Amino acid sequence: MMASMRVVKELEDLQKKPPPYLRNLSSDDANVLVWHALLLPDQPPYHLKAFNLRISFPPEYPFKPPMIKFTTKIYHPNVDENGQICLPIISSENWKPCTKTCQVLEALNVLVNRPNIREPLRMDLADLLTQNPELFRKNAEEFTLRFGVDRPS
């Protein structure tokens, strides 16, 4: 009950004043603990398209962190092939119940725009970004153009 009340309030707040990097924020009709959103990164190579997200809140929220998953494929060292994200702010050891979803989404936007090669989920992409940044950016741009979602106007 507490989780849904807080989640509803956070959703309403974000819908009233959405950050510039987020669009189409909504919850599942049947479950307010599941949100969908469109992330619009502003840095190359990800700025060319947008990416669908699914945000799932556990019943224990805010005492347990939400889970965020990319449902659009993304070529990124901190996102695995299944869309799972390595985002320190929502890790069990770092999570604080006072953290709001808007802060989590801001951290995600920063991470997408500036990959963290110290905590990769895809070591191959972290290595490529370190050893050959131009090739990484070229591959990421091609992947983004192929799999990304058109950005809303």
Swiss-Prot record:
UniProt superkingdom: Eukaryota
Reactions it catalyzes: S-ubiquitinyl-[E1 ubiquitin-activating enzyme]-L-cysteine + [E2 ubiquitin-conjugating enzyme]-L-cysteine = [E1 ubiquitin-activating enzyme]-L-cysteine + S-ubiquitinyl-[E2 ubiquitin-conjugating enzyme]-L-cysteine
Alphabetized UniProt keyword annotations: Transferase, Ubl conjugation, Ubl conjugation pathway
GO process annotations (BP): innate immune response; ISG15-protein conjugation; protein modification process; protein polyubiquitination; ubiquitin-dependent protein catabolic process
Domain UBC core span(s) in chain numbering: 2-149
SMART domains linked to this entry: UBCc (SM00212)
Stimuli inducing this protein: By IFNB1/IFN-beta.
Tissue spec. comment: Present in natural killer cells (at protein level).
PROSITE patterns xrefs: UBC_1, UBC_2
E.C. no: 2.3.2.23
Catalytic residues identified in the record: C86 (glycyl thioester intermediate)
Any one GO cellular component localisation term in the record: cytosol
Post-translation changes: ISGylated.
Pathway info: Protein modification; protein ubiquitination
Molecular function, one GO term: ISG15 transferase activity
Family, similarity comment: Belongs to the ubiquitin-conjugating enzyme family.
Assembly description: Interacts with RNF19A, RNF19B and RNF144B. Interacts with FLT3 (tyrosine phosphorylated).
Task of the protein: Catalyzes the covalent attachment of ubiquitin or ISG15 to other proteins. Functions in the E6/E6-AP-induced ubiquitination of p53/TP53. Promotes ubiquitination and subsequent proteasomal degradation of FLT3.
Protein name per the record: Ubiquitin/ISG15-conjugating enzyme E2 L6
UniProt organism field: Homo sapiens (Human)
